[in-house]
From Swiss-Prot:
It is an enzyme of class 3 (hydrolase). It catalyses: Endohydrolysis of the N-glycosidic bond at one specific adenosine on the 28S rRNA. Its EC number is 3.2.2.22. GO terms for biological process: defense response to virus; negative regulation of translation. The keyword Hydrolase applies. Belongs to the ribosome-inactivating protein family. Type 1 RIP subfamily. The keyword Hydrolase applies. Pfam families: RIP (PF00161). Signal peptide: none annotated. One of its GO terms (molecular function) is rRNA N-glycosylase activity. This is Ribosome-inactivating protein luffin-B. The active site is at 160. It comes from Luffa aegyptiaca (Sponge gourd). Keywords: Antiviral defense, Hydrolase, Plant defense, Protein synthesis inhibitor, Toxin.
């Protein structure tokens, strides 16, 4: 695997080290406003990196991540691989986990479909190290409904934390006790990454101003407009994005 994280003996330092390693494992050729810009495209096996996660019992799961958008395409448990029911994941299955027995999960990996499959919304699903342990255990012993809820925990603890320093901090706060995500974290996960990525890139040729303001929710549940690169968002650190998605420039 390119990056790995084990819950056994983990603390805030080892988790932060893992998230930093995950960011570094995602290739970037340029920066915009000092934020790494992910590749617009990649082909073949070079489009994916592998991330290994282990629960407290040292049961390991390996996940394949698309380097252009930090989406999890599928995962490997022992000799069985599981891929989301979508075209990008089918493509990934041609390049990663070769020789494994392939199972198609009956839903795609976006939040709405995962929430439908899980029968739960993210607002009600706690995050934290114990939540991550339960999620990894659920995925290890595959059950499609439990796996959907587990995926929601894993996505936020890994991919979203790598995109936003703020979300990484939110997970660290939840290490000692499970707690549902903050309104600000959920707001950032809901399209804000794509919208902010696009506007930050467009602002380069617009004197630092966004062409379209991006509205996010702060920790108190209030709407906040980000209008330019210098916007000091009321939520501490919420706009310290650490990765940008190149695909969203139009």
């Amino acid at each position: 695997a390119n990056v790995s994280f084990s819950l056994s003996g983990a603390d805030s330092k080892s988790y932060s080290k893992f998230i930093t390693a995950l960011r570094k494992a995602l290739p970037s050729k340029e920066k915009v406003s000092n934020i790494p810009l992910l590749l617009p495209s990649a082909s073949g096996a070079s489009r994916y990196i592998l991330m290994q996660l282990s629960n407290y019992d040292a049961k390991a799961i390996t996940m394949a991540i698309d380097v252009t958008n930090v989406y999890i395409m599928g995962y490997l448990v022992n000799s069985t691989s599981y891929f989301a029911n979508e075209s990008d994941a089918k493509l990934a299955s041609q390049y990663v986990f070769k020789g494994s027995t392939l199972v198609t999960i009956p839903y795609s990996g976006n939040y709405e479909r995962l929430q439908n499959a899980a029968g739960k919304i993210r607002e009600k699903i706690p995050l934290g190290f114990r939540a991550l342990d339960s999620a990894l255990t659920s995925i290890f012993h595959y059950d499609s409904t439990a796996a959907a809820a587990a995926f929601l925990v894993i996505l936020q603890t890994t991919a979203e934390a790598s995109r936003f320093k703020y979300i990484e901090g939110q997970i660290i706060e939840r290490i000692p006790k499970n707690e549902v995500p903050s309104p600000a974290a959920l707001s950032l996960e809901n399209e804000a990454w794509s919208l902010l990525s696009k506007q930050i890139q467009l602002a380069q040729t617009n004197n630092g101003a966004f062409r379209t303001p991006v509205v996010i929710i702060d920790n108190k549940g209030q709407r906040v407009e980000i209008t330019n690169l210098a916007s000091k968002v009321q939520i501490k650190d919420v706009n310290s994005k650490l990765l940008l998605n190149k695909q969203n420039i139009a």
